[in-house]
Every structure is written in C-alpha cells, then in structure tokens.
C-alpha cells in the first residue's frame, strides 16, 4: 500500500456507520459529508470493507451497516481490507523495481532494507491489532 488516506478514511467511514446506523441511513453521500471525500471514493472503500466482511451495504439508498460488533473489528482488519494491492501485497514500504545492479548501492539496496522494513511493517500491524473500533468509539 502506498501511504495514502485509504486507511484513515476507512476508519472514519466505519466510525460513522457505528455512530449513526441506529438513527440514520448511512449512505455513501452521508459518509462523504462527514469525511469531506467524494462519494465515489467512499463507495470504493465500502466495497473493500464489504468484501472483507466488515460492513454490509444495500443497493441504492439502503445505506451501510456493520457486519460485526465494534469490539470485534480491529484497525488491522480495516488496514488489511483497504490496503491490499492487486498482487496481494499490503506493505507500507515498496521497493523501487529497477535499481542499478552494477552500482554498489543499487545492487544491494533491497537486501539492506528488507530486514528493517519488514520489522517496521510487523510493528505497524501489531499496533493496529491492539485497537478496536469500540476503543475509538469511546473517544468520540
């Protein structure tokens, strides 16, 4: 995953659904009003969250609801849902693909960076797994 806003917008989306779903139809337009994002982007994120089994969406203006309880959804679940690339990679850190193999730096850059970046990715995922949507709802 490239460093972008998908994760934070997805978390915002889920918090909106959890906060408002009892009293409102939480549509992509509704969520867009809270996030300040285009409804098309919200629908894309909702599609990924639905594919991951985190939310349910109803066609048209039916709105969205959570598929699980808020204490069963971690930030890692959300991260996995929205950050995975088409090739299955969800790493925050991606290598540039064509370093110069004849250069003493370029020929070893992947090897040199693999361990520390893998450790950082693991730490990120461990931290995200410690926080649930319920934890965040308590702070709203």
At which residue positions do the language-model features occur?
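Short alpha-helical segments that sit at the start of domains
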Residues: 1-14
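Beta-hairpin "wing" of winged helix-turn-helix
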Residues: 52-61, 65-67
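Non-DNA-binding regulatory cores of transcription-related proteins
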Residues: 68-140
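Short amphipathic alpha-helical interface segments
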Residues: 13-22
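Basic amphipathic alpha-helical segments that dock to polyanions
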Residues: 46-50
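Short coil turns linking two alpha-helices in DNA-binding domains
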Residues: 38-41
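A short alpha-helical element within helix-turn-helix/winged-helix DNA-binding domains
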Residues: 26-36
């Amino acid at each position: 995953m490239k460093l972008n806003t998908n994760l934070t917008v997805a978390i915002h989306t889920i918090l909106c659904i959890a906060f408002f779903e009892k009293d409102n139809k939480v549509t992509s337009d509704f969520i867009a009003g809270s996030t300040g994002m285009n409804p098309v982007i919200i629908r894309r994120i909702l599609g990924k969250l639905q594919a991951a089994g985190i939310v349910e969406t109803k066609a048209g203006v039916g709105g969205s609801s959570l598929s699980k309880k808020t204490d069963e959804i971690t930030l890692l679940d959300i991260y996995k849902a929205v950050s995975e690339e088409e090739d299955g990679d969800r790493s925050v850190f991606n290598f540039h693909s064509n370093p110069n193999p004849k250069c003493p730096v370029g020929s070893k850059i992947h090897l040199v960076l693999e361990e520390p970046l893998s450790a950082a990715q693991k730490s990120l995922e461990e931290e995200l797994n410690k926080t649930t949507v319920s934890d965040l709802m308590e702070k709203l």
